[in-house]
Amino acid sequence: MTSIRSASTPVEVRRLGTLDYTSAWQLQRETADARVAGGPDTLLLLEHPPVYTAGKRTEPHERPLDGTPVVDTDRGGKITWHGPGQLVGYPIIGLTEPLDVVNFVRRLEESLITVCAELGLHTERVEGRSGVWVPADDLRPARKIGAIGIRVSRATTLHGFALNCDCDLSAFSSIIPCGITDAGVTSLTAELGRRVTVDEVADRVAAAVCDALDGRLPVGHHETLNVG
C-alpha cells in the first residue's frame, strides 16, 4: 500500500493529556489551518472530560433523555460519549488526490484493530458500519470498542477516533451510541479482564496510525457479516 498523505515528512504526534472538547475543537481548526498553509500533518492524542457530542446525522430520540447537554459537531456519524479512560485521536492530515475518505477511515480502523490484537483482543469490522468491534458470541451481541467520525475540508481531515480503554461504560446508557440499537459498547478493560489505561495504549496507537496512513500497515480483511 502507498501513503494516503500528501506530505512525505513524518506525522507530528502531540500528547495533550486531558483537554475539554471545545478547546480541542479550536486546536483542531488551528492545526488544520496550519496544515493547509504548509505545516506538518499532526496527530493529537488526548482524553476529554465527560461530554456527549453529536454528529450531523444524530436524531432527536438518540440524545440523552435526561436533558444532559450535548455538543453539536460537524463530523460525520451520530451521538457518542467522550470521557476519562478513553483515548481520543484527532489526525489532522493532508490527503492525496483524488480524495478517498473511505480508505482513510479503513486505515484508522486497521490501526485500532492492530493495537487491540497486540493487547490480546480480537476485533473486527462490521459490514456497513464504521468503527472497531468485538464480535458477537453466544451470550452477547457485537460490542463497539472503537468509534470513528471524521470530516474532510480543504483536503485536510478533522475529528477522528476514540478507543475505549478503561472508561465508565455506564455513560453510554443515556444515549443511543452512534445511533445503533442492536449492539453494545465495551472497553479494553472489560474485555481483557485487567485494567488497560490510556497511557498503556497511546504510543501503540500513535505508531499504528502512522504506519496505516503511510501504507506500512496494510488494510486487512476483518469483516463480520452482522452484529447479532
Swiss-Prot record:
List the catalytic activities from the record. Answer: octanoyl-[ACP] + L-lysyl-[protein] = N(6)-octanoyl-L-lysyl-[protein] + holo-[ACP] + H(+)
The protein's matches in CDD domains, at most eight in alphabetical order, are given as: LipB (cd16444)
Q: Which domain of life is it from?
A: Bacteria
**BPL/LPL catalytic domain: from which residue to which, for each copy?**
37-217
Q: Which GO terms describe its biological process?
A: protein modification process
Give the pathway annotation: Protein modification; protein lipoylation via endogenous pathway; protein N(6)-(lipoyl)lysine from octanoyl-[acyl-carrier-protein]: step 1/2
Give me the residues that bind substrate, please. 75-82, 147-149, 160-162
Annotated Gene Ontology cellular component terms: cytoplasm
- Keyword field: Acyltransferase, Cytoplasm, Transferase
Name the SUPFAM superfamilies on file: Class II aaRS and biotin synthetases (SSF55681)
Q: Which GO terms describe its molecular function?
A: lipoyl(octanoyl) transferase activity
The UniProt record lists the EC number as 2.3.1.181
Q: Where is the active site?
A: 178
Question: Which HAMAP family does UniProt cross-reference here?
Answer: LipB
Q: Which family does it belong to?
A: Belongs to the LipB family.
What remark does the entry add?
In the reaction, the free carboxyl group of octanoic acid is attached via an amide linkage to the epsilon-amino group of a specific lysine residue of lipoyl domains of lipoate-dependent enzymes.
Say what the protein does.
Answer: Catalyzes the transfer of endogenously produced octanoic acid from octanoyl-acyl-carrier-protein onto the lipoyl domains of lipoate-dependent enzymes. Lipoyl-ACP can also act as a substrate although octanoyl-ACP is likely to be the physiological substrate.
Q: What is this protein called?
A: Octanoyltransferase
The record lists the organism as Mycolicibacterium smegmatis (strain ATCC 700084 / mc(2)155)
